[in-house]
Curated annotation (Swiss-Prot):
Listed GO MF terms: methyltransferase activity; transferase activity, transferring alkyl or aryl (other than methyl) groups
Record protein name field: tRNA U34 carboxymethyltransferase
Listed Pfam families: Methyltransf_9
Superkingdom: Bacteria
EC number(s) recorded for this UniProt protein: 2.5.1.-
Species annotation: Aeromonas hydrophila subsp. hydrophila (strain ATCC 7966 / DSM 30187 / BCRC 13018 / CCUG 14551 / JCM 1027 / KCTC 2358 / NCIMB 9240 / NCTC 8049)
SUPFAM superfamilies referenced in this protein's UniProt entry, alphabetically: S-adenosyl-L-methionine-dependent methyltransferases
HAMAP family registered for this protein in UniProt: tRNA_carboxymethyltr_CmoB (MF_01590)
């Protein structure tokens, strides 16, 4: 069973210590109540991962741990087989002792679009909401973050993260907690808060933006990435049923509307720094994610539309600063 004791000990000595009033009970309840049928199998796979000195670790330009020479052929096949227990791998990629985990998403491309526009992460406390397998947590550590905390309720993402951390020498600069943002108290402690690919899944986008704000210290930075449509300040797409075969898509604003929402929630210096059409090179089926992917969600006769006839996925990156309360 995954143990969060190291995280408790870590935050007891820093600005997140007040989180200990609620967090241990929440995670104890999660461990007790989580009934995902595959969790025992994933835990067994985690426990079977061999101890291998990480040696070379590269987190700045990519996530690469160790080298192919660190493992013999038989051991490498064993490790790859164990890592495949955690399929589908959606967010990455990762390279572990010469094993390339080719994930569905090229999350490194998103990072390359975001990084030039954000404040330097060196020495910062960072929160990544909806962090998936934690790929971007490692890139944040690679940029010098003092502590990178990710939250995502998926037990599979937690196990994927712990598998990578195992090979990274149990690095304690990054942590993933199986929680949703609605379960966090108003910590007001992070220098930077990321929410990437989450807003359109929320029934109340304004509430989500306010929840993000409540995690930031005064003058902290919000990095918000989400689906957008073309249009003016009052244009918002609300799918009648599905968007790209996803049922849980609620609001897709124009970039102008998104900017207004964030300003109304008490942020200043709000700016859209990037817009990008998602391509089938960035999101695609791979040997590590064999289910449907973006090409299956687009109209086969017109890739500018989803199969439902909505505009194809376009993503914007917004940066903002929390005004003082």
């Amino acid at each position: 069973m995954i143990d969060f004791a190291n995280f408790y000990q870590l935050i007891a000595k820093n600005r997140l210590s007040h989180w200990l009033h609620t967090l241990p009970a929440q995670l104890h309840a999660w461990q007790h109540d989580n009934q995902h049928g595959d969790l025992p199998r994933w835990n067994r796979a985690l426990n079977k991962l061999p101890q291998v000195a990480p040696g070379h670790i590269e987190l700045h330009s990519r996530v690469e741990i160790g080298s192919a020479e660190s493992l013999g052929e038989g051991e490498r096949k064993k490790v790859e087989s164990l890592l495949r227990h955690f399929m589908p791998w959606r967010k990455g990629p990762f390279t572990v002792h010469g094993i390339h985990i080719d994930t569905e998403w090229r999350s490194d491309w998103k990072w390359d679009r975001v990084l030039p526009h954000i404040s330097p992460l060196a020495g910062r406390y960072v929160l990544d909401v909806g962090c998936g397998s934690g790929y971007h947590l490692w890139r944040m550590v690679g940029e010098g973050a003092k502590l990178a905390v990710g939250i995502d309720p998926s037990p599979l993402f937690l196990c994927q993260f712990e598998a990578i951390r195992h090979f990274a020498g149990n690095d304690q600069r990054a942590h993933l907690l199986p929680l949703g943002i609605q379960e966090l108290p108003e910590l007001r402690a992070f220098d930077t808060v990321f929410s990437m690919g989450v807003l359109y899944h929320r029934k109340s986008p304004i509430e989500h933006i306010e929840q993000l704000r409540n995690q930031l210290k005064d003058d902290g930075e919000l990095v918000l990435e989400t689906l957008v449509i073309d249009g003016g300040v009052n244009d918002v797409l609300v799918p009648t049923d599905r968007y790209g075969k996803m049922r849980n898509v609620w609001f897709i604003p124009s970039s102008a509307a998104l900017k207004l929402w964030v300003e109304r929630c008490g942020f200043t210096d709000v700016r859209i720094v990037d817009e990008n059409m998602t391509s089938t090179d960035e999101q695609r089926r791979t040997d590590w994610m064999i289910n449907e992917s973006l090409s299956d969600y687009l109209d086969p006769t017109n890739p500018a539309l989803t199969v439902e006839g909505h505009p194809a996925p376009k993503r914007a990156v917004l940066i903002a600063r929390k005004a003082k309360d």
